[in-house]
Structures are given as structure tokens and as C-alpha cells.
Amino acid sequence: MDSDTILREARLIKNLKHSHIPVIYDIEEDDISICIIEEYISGKSLRSYINNTDNIKTSEICDIAVKLCDILEYLHNCDNEIIHLDIKPDNIIIDEHNNVKLIDFGSSIHKAGLTQAGMISPGYAAPEQYGGKELTYQTDIYSVGMVLKFMADSNSTVHNKLYPVINKCTRHNQYRRYKNVKALRWELEQTARSDITFSRK
């Protein structure tokens, strides 16, 4: 990551106030170097967490995704209307209290409708991120769907009601995905409840 990208990311995060986004305490720069004082985020990446968790339940998968949706709802509705554009298991941290943290804003942009894109993560990037197409909040929703798929595929006993949610998130046409993360979160909450009910039978 070049110095301009690092500085842009730091300035972007510094203006955000959310408990599950890293805090930038200070940015110091001169002609030679950049010094960024940032909150240390402890925990495991979601990839590591899933790889070291046996038989994760559908309700837990939904809980992680709901917490991620809470962060994205804040980003999408803040003054700068931020689209993250690099949601993947490596950029999601699970701390010791099972809180979900979102890191790496190097590819993020202000406001929906722009076509600028930074680094693309194959397997998690939406189709519109390739080829300079319009980027919207549904671009992030696609990536959430792929993260859901990553978690669901780790356990063959995952409740099959989760897969229709994944399929809607990852539709090729972004305007046929969930309208916003609030709608996606509601669907995840319903799926989690049905899984708990199913487990009790």
C-alpha cells in the first residue's frame, strides 16, 4: 500500500465514530514520513476464527453478519456515505468478547454512484467492481453475501434457510440484491430465529 493510500485511509477513519471501527488518534506527516497513531485491534480474523471453530451454528453465523451489517449501516448513512469495497474474512476481526470489528479502509470511497475502486479481492468483490461500473451500497452487500458463504460452507450442517439469503446478496445485477443492509439484517435475524427454533425440536 503506497503512502497516499495509507494517508487517505487514515483521514477517512479519523472522521468515523463507531465502536467497531479502529480509532485514529493522530496523524503526523512531513516531507519524508507519515506517522499514524491508531487503536490496536486485538482478536482473530474471521478466516482464522472460522478455521478454528468446529460446527459453527447458523445462528452464530447470522449473529456475526448482523454485527457486520450494523457497521455497514453506520458507514452507508454517515455524512460521507462510505462504501467499504473490501469486505472479506481477513478484514473482519472477532475480539475476545465476540465483538465484530471492520478494518482496512484502503479501497473505500465516498458516496454511492462513483466508479473509483482500489484493490479488488477476488472471490469477494462484486461484479461491478470489475470494469469501472457504478458502485453502490449493494456492492458491499454482495461482499457480505460471499462472507456468509465462506462461513456457511465451513459447516455441512448449516440450516438451508441461510442459502437463499446468500443467493440474494450475490445476484449479478446489483439492483436485484437487498435494497440496503437494514433489509439484509432483518432477514438474517429471522433466519437466526428459525435456526434456534429448529435446533430445539
Residue ranges and their predicted role:
Residues 1-15:
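AlphaC helix of the eukaryotic protein kinase fold
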Residues 64-65:
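Activation segment signature within eukaryotic-like protein kinase domains
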Residues 140:
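Conserved catalytic-loop aspartate of Hanks-type protein kinases
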Residues 76-94:
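Catalytic-loop of the protein kinase fold
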Residues 46-56:
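AlphaC helix of the protein kinase catalytic domain
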Residues 31-45:
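Conserved short submotifs of the Hanks-type protein kinase catalytic core
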